Amino acid sequence: KINENAARTLEYAYNDWCIYQLAKALNRPKKEQKLFAQRAMNYRNIFDKESKLMRGRNEDGQFQSPFSPLKWGDAFTEGNSWHYSWSVFHDPQGLIDLMGGKAPFVQMLDSVFAVPPLFDDSYYGQVIHEIREMTVMNMGNYAHGNQPIQHMIYLYNYVGQPWKAQYWLRQVMDRMYTPGPDGYCGDEDNGQTSAWYVFSALGFYPVCPGTDEYVLGAPLFKKATLHLENGNNLVIDAPDNDENTM
């Protein structure tokens, strides 16, 4: 088997999609564009219809067995299947379809918060800090302390339940970013965890970097003004905003 094969497959698929977008913008030959467009769909190859989750495969192409979505590492990187199964930034509708449509997709999103913060650390042989942070956060199997799952909450918007996104976004911002000595929730790889907070506090987030799309969330402020490099201002105006109004 190849270590971290599921995580690599998912991230390479997204990378190939980004290359595809660049190839289109540069008007590269259609053959090149088609190649990377096809490779961007490779995430489908590790979707397990039975569990409705992403699952690692062996070199012979068979799914790794036995399979536990609570197992950290192995086919994944510092996370488990509950965390990585949402890593289809570039094709959320495709992921929704794989999981059976909107209702099953919502059920799977809900399950992340409903499944207790249990874990299998046998691959690492110890409780790595990312696992410890997930258990301390006590938000089910949602592990905001590491980057792979941080966009997941915004996916509620894609299936017509933005109020769930708004609720959980506020929960994360209020509980996992505080001024106390234990007030920061985990890794800060490439500035992602703080960038998540800045975007989310303003009320929008780039679920899929590589596009010009931002997904709406729940701003923390009644008004915020961003002074853009081109001299324009972006104003987020939410005069009725408070802790109970999202």
How would you name each of these model-derived features?
Residues 1-41, 45-220, 224-235, 240:
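Active-site core of glycosidic bond-cleaving carbohydrate-active enzymes
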Residues 241-246:
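C-terminal beta-sandwich/jelly-roll accessory domains of carbohydrate-active enzymes
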